[in-house]
Each structure stands twice: as structure tokens, then as C-alpha cells.
A protein has these predicted regions:
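Boundary at the C-terminal end of the N-terminal hydrophobic targeting segment
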Residues: 17-19
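Sec-dependent N-terminal signal peptides
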Residues: 4-13
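Active-site-adjacent substrate/metal-binding segments within catalytic domains
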Residues: 32-110
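Extracellular glycoside hydrolase catalytic/binding regions
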Residues: 23-29, 53, 58, 76, ...
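Active-site loop/turn elements of alpha/beta-hydrolase fold enzymes
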Residues: 80-85, 119-122, 241, 276
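Alpha-helical transmembrane segments and their juxtamembrane interfaces
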Residues: 12-13, 89, 250
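Metal-dependent enolase-superfamily TIM-barrel catalytic cores that perform enediolate-based chemistry
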Residues: 93-117, 121-126, 136, 140
Length: 318
């Protein structure tokens, strides 16, 4: 624990705390080879936080929380995890889902921070995803802030079936939005990036593939697999990661997290950390007594949140 606290403090003290305007700075994102690039074609790394499931922690889906994450935590990207499973999910209650998602998306646009619209599911719902992302592309496709994550974490799907799904959903998005980046999940909880490397999608531009890691569970093996994919010119985006075990709970492994972040920085991979929520688990960053909006004092930020906030302040500073 002493070493963990030392790491947190060193991150917090390593740099200035001034926020930047990432969209004003980088503009329309594009993918060149394995690299996410800015409007000028220069490499860019996005770093930020994922909100928890909208249907479990809706109180954090508000414009002031977005403002806090951008201005106080130095996030350059925020992920809005729209739940497709569990009670009150988007399929059961789309009106409630959009009451949560819309303020976050529009606050991100106003704050000039990138926003990931995440279809947070573990099962395929092709028709529903096409309809949703078609609507999102029509409404928000004109904004360079928007990134579409079309499938959070496939579990049982083969890469062959995921390619078919992605082709249909991306095709629907591209009817209305030819440019904004699309994130595609890969098999087995976004672990099997090697299958993507052997047979990537064809016929689309500005597409990236997601890898998810939890530092106390995933180590050298997945890091090696990810690096090998990048060396094969596969553009990787870590749209969800945790400093804990894969369950979202358990021990915090700051040393493994440092290795992951070092690899991401070296390879130019963007990374997002899970989650802004108040669940009784170690990857949840806030205590239940934290306000819905922030700013959040240190006494309501849990150890994982302090570690993530410190890393963001260290790396997202110009």
C-alpha cells in the first residue's frame, strides 16, 4: 500500500493541473495505419474515464460531471456506457437511456472533449444497434467530438460473426457520418486481438479495434498480444481498463497498470479507465457520499480513482 500511495502522489505532483481543449487542439480524428491521428495527420493519444452503466449509475450522467472530468481530472475523452443488459437497459427503456446519454454527449461537445458512445453489451443485437447508431450518426455525426463504440465486450461471438455485425453497423453509420472513428470489439471480452490481426475488416476507413485489460489479471501475455497486433498495423484503442482484477473488484495492481500505460504511451495507444461510479468494488472510483456532479475532494475518491486521476494529470498536460 505504501508503494501504491507513492505512485499516486508522484503522478499527482508530476505536472501542472491545467486542463486542455482536446477537440480544439486535435480536431477531426483519423486513423493512419495503426495510429490514431489528429486533423493534421499527427499521432494523438486520448486518455480518459468511462462512466459506469447508465442504468446502474444514472446520477453521474450529467453535464457537470463531464465538466469536472475534463477540467479537474484532465480527461481528453469520456466514455458513456449505455447499458444494453440488466434492468432498465436501453432496449427496455430507450427514453430513460437517452435522458442519461444526451446530457453527457452534449456536455462533451460543449466542453470540447471527445465522447465515446458505447453500446455496452455482451450479446449481439444487430438490428437494434444499427437503428441506434444510425440515429446517433444523423444527430451527432457533424461533430468531430464523437467516437462510436459499437460493441463493448463480445463474449461468445466468433471473429467471423463479429465482422459481419461490424460491417452492418458501420455501414449504417457511414450513411450519415463518413469520418468519425468507429471502435470494434473483438472476441473473448476484447482479449483476442490476434484474431483481428489475422483478418481485419476491409472496406472501411477510420476504424479501430478495442482491447480491454484489468491490470491485476492481465499482464505480459495480453500486452505482448496487443503489441504484436500493432506491429501488424492493427489500430488498437483501449476503451476500457481497470487497475483491479477483471471482476472489477479485488486487489489493485499499480505496477502492472504502470506497465500497461508505458506500453500505451510507447505505441501511441489511447486508453480509458473504468469506472466513474460509486459501486462497492475497487475499480469504482467514488464513494457513495460523493456528489453526482463534482468536483470531488480526495476524501470521496477511492484508491483506484486517485491512481487514475494522477495518471491523467501526468499524461494529459501540455
Amino acid at each position: 500500500m505504501k508503494k501504491l500511495l507513492t505512485i499516486i502522489l508522484s503522478c499527482l505532483c508530476a505536472c501542472s493541473v491545467h486542463a486542455i481543449d482536446p477537440v480544439k487542439q486535435s480536431g477531426q480524428l483519423q486513423v493512419k495505419g495503426a495510429q490514431l491521428c489528429d486533423q493534421q495527420g499527427q499521432p494523438v493519444i486520448l486518455r480518459g474515464v468511462s462512466l459506469g452503466w447508465h442504468n446502474l449509475w444514472p446520477r453521474f450522467y450529467n453535464k457537470k460531471a463531464v465538466q469536472t472530468l475534463k477540467q479537474d481530472w484532465n480527461c481528453t475523452v469520456i466514455r458513456a456506457a449505455m447499458g444494453i443488459m440488466i434492468e432498465d437497459n436501453y432496449l427496455e427503456n430507450p427514453e430513460f437511456a437517452m435522458q442519461c446519454m444526451t446530457p453527457v454527449i452534449e456536455a462533451a461537445i460543449k466542453q470540447n472533449v471527445y465522447i465515446i458512445i458505447d453500446w455496452h453489451s455482451h450479446v449481439t443485437k444487430t438490428a437494434e444497434a444499427k437503428e441506434f447508431f444510425g440515429h446517433m450518426a444523423q444527430k451527432y455525426g457533424k461533430y468531430p467530438h464523437v467516437i462510436y463504440e459499437i460493441y463493448n465486450e463480445p463474449v461468445e461471438d466468433s471473429w467471423t460473426s463479429l465482422k459481419k455485425y461490424a460491417t452492418e453497423v458501420i455501414g449504417e453509420i457511414r450513411k450519415y457520418d463518413p469520418d468519425n472513428v468507429v471502435l470494434v470489439g473483438c472476441p473473448h471480452w476484447d482479449q483476442d486481438i490476434h484474431l483481428v490481426a489475422d483478418s481485419p475488416l476491409q472496406g472501411f476507413t477510420n476504424v479501430m479495434y478495442t482491447v480491454h485489460f484489468y491490470a491485476a489479471t492481465h499482464g505480459d501475455s495480453l500486452r505482448k498480444r496487443t503489441e504484436e497486433a500493432v506491429k501488424k498495423d492493427i489500430p488498437v484503442f483501449i476503451s476500457e481498463s481497470g487497475v483491479t482484477e477483471a471482476s472489477g473488484d479485488g486487489k489493485i495492481d499499480a505496477e502492472s497498470e504502470e506497465k500497461w500505460v508505458e506500453m500505451c504511451e510507447r505505441l501511441g495507444i489511447s486508453w480509458v479507465c473504468w469506472s466513474l461510479s460509486d459501486k462497492n468494488e475497487s475499480s469504482s472510483m467514488l464513494l457513495p457520499r460523493a456528489t453526482a456532479t463534482g468536483p470531488w475532494a480526495d476524501d470521496v475518491i477511492k484508491v483506484s480513482g486517485k491512481l487514475v486521476k494522477g495518471l491523467l494529470k501526468k499524461y494529459n498536460t501540455k
